[in-house]
């Protein structure tokens, strides 16, 4: 009877066969990525496939951090590593040690991926660009402390304005440490707040040599800067992420200095030109005002001003006399109307009635009695006459008109 093996035995045996295979121990495979998953641990799990087959792959975090691009489903790649068996599931898979795009370079893909990402976030939008000051007091320069770049910037700066202050923040401009140093330099210049504009500069080079200026950390530090930033990386045909996010791009470091530093000779020439134009404009204005003043002086009023004043004074006197006459007439009419009203009121006075022989009767409460219904027998009444007062007691009351 044949020997009976466990599943683990067979899987382990197959693993040993595969692991000892000289081809499978170091292999590069071309395929299209599918089912890509970037685990929170940093590991990458995916499948590469062609028209007829597929192969499961895993890339652990220690290798994944070295990738210059972000793998995506549908991307054609060349994956290098070794084939082994995952004993638990009995599946063979490729353990990837490196990966690169098939055809287009990894750096180029990484560049396009980051560019698209930052563009979606609005880091390149024109409305977010800050204006470069016309007359900066000092300029910060983020570049290497040695080489042609800093010399060119210094030469151009002092040729255009010998009194301009330059603040150099030296950094590495290529290599693994460069991106972090550049971002930190921009941050520090903002914290110190002693410069009015920042130039981030580097000379020409390959995509790999310029790569620090394509790193996301540099792009975000430029975007977060409160101080305007001019990018001057590489030659005129070189474009970096730094160029897109900066407030202004210069084709070369020398051009950046020309954009940041105003030419004092040109400024003085413009100032003199403005001064001459202002004097000319002021002279024309004075001449115009003199002509207007002469025309005014030629008018009769200004030629004989006292005659005009006397005429107005006579007019004022006439108006005053007219107003006095009108007021006197109005007062006279009002006095007459008042006298007539006083006469009417006097005729209606109770005292006038008493003078004509009539009398006035009041009850004990002091009210005038004008009908017998207000009187009761026994009431004491006051009778007012023109020449005195009489008090009487009511002994009888009769209703009816006694004079009919």
UniProtKB/Swiss-Prot annotation:
Kindly indicate whether the keyword Nuclease belongs to this entry: yes
Q: What is its main location?
A: cytoplasm
Q: Which reaction does it catalyse?
A: Exonucleolytic cleavage in either 5'- to 3'- or 3'- to 5'-direction to yield nucleoside 5'-phosphates
UniProt keyword annotations, A-Z: Cytoplasm, Exonuclease, Hydrolase, Nuclease
Keyword Nucleotide-binding in annotation = no
Enzyme Commission (EC) number: 3.1.11.6
Under the heading Pfam families, the entry gives: Exonuc_VII_L, tRNA_anti_2
InterPro entries named among the record's database cross-references: Exonuc_VII_L, Exonuc_VII_lsu_C, OB-fold_nuc-bd_dom, Succinyl-CoA_synth-like
List the GO molecular function terms: exodeoxyribonuclease VII activity; nucleic acid binding
Assembly description? Heterooligomer composed of large and small subunits.
Hey, which family's this protein in? Belongs to the XseA family.
Q: What is this protein called?
A: Exodeoxyribonuclease 7 large subunit
Source organism: Ruminiclostridium cellulolyticum (strain ATCC 35319 / DSM 5812 / JCM 6584 / H10) (Clostridium cellulolyticum)
- Name the gene: xseA
């Amino acid at each position: 009877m044949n020997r009976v093996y466990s599943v683990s035995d067979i899987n382990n045996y197959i693993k040993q066969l595969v692991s000892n295979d000289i081809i499978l121990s170091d292999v590069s495979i071309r395929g299209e990525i599918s089912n890509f998953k970037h685990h929170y641990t940093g590991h990458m799990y995916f499948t590469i496939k062609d028209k007829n087959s597929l192969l499961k792959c895993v890339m652990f975090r220690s290798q994944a951090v070295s990738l210059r691009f972000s793998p995506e489903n549908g991307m054609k790649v060349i994956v290098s590593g070794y084939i082994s068996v995952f004993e638990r599931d009995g599946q063979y898979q490729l353990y990837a040690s490196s990966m690169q795009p098939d055809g287009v370079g990894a750096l180029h893909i990484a560049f396009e991926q980051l560019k698209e990402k930052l563009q979606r976030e609005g880091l390149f939008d024109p409305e977010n660009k800050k204006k470069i000051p016309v007359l900066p007091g000092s300029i910060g320069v983020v570049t290497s402390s040695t080489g042609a770049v800093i010399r060119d910037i210094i030469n151009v700066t002092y040729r255009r304005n010998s009194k301009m202050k330059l603040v150099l923040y030296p950094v590495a401009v290529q290599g693994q440490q460069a991106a972090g140093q550049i971002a930190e330099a921009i941050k520090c210049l903002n914290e110190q707040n002693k410069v009015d504009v920042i130039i981030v500069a580097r000379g020409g080079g390959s995509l790999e040599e310029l790569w620090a200026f394509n790193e996301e950390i540099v792009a975000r530090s430029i975007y977060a800067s409160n101080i305007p930033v001019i990018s001057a990386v590489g030659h005129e045909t070189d474009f970096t992420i730094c160029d897109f996010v900066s407030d202004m791009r210069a084709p070369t470091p020398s051009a950046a200095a020309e954009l940041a530093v105003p030419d004092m000779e040109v400024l003085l020439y413009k100032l003199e030109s403005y001064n001459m134009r202002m004097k000319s404009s002021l002279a024309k204005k004075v001449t115009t005002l003199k002509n207007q003043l002469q025309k005014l002086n030629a008018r009769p009023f200004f030629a004989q001003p006292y005659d005009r004043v006397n005429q107005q004074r006579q007019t004022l006197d006439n108006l005053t006399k007219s107003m006095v006459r009108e007021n006197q007439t109005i007062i006279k009419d009002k006095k007459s109307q008042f006298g007539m009203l006083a006469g009417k009121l006097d005729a209606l006075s109770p005292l006038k009635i008493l003078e004509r022989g009539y009398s006035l009767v009041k009850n004990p409460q002091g009210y005038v009695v004008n009908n017998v219904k207000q009187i009761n027998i026994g009431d004491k009444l006051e009778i007012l006459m023109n020449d005195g007062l009489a008090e009487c007691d009511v002994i009888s009351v009769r209703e009816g008109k006694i004079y009919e």
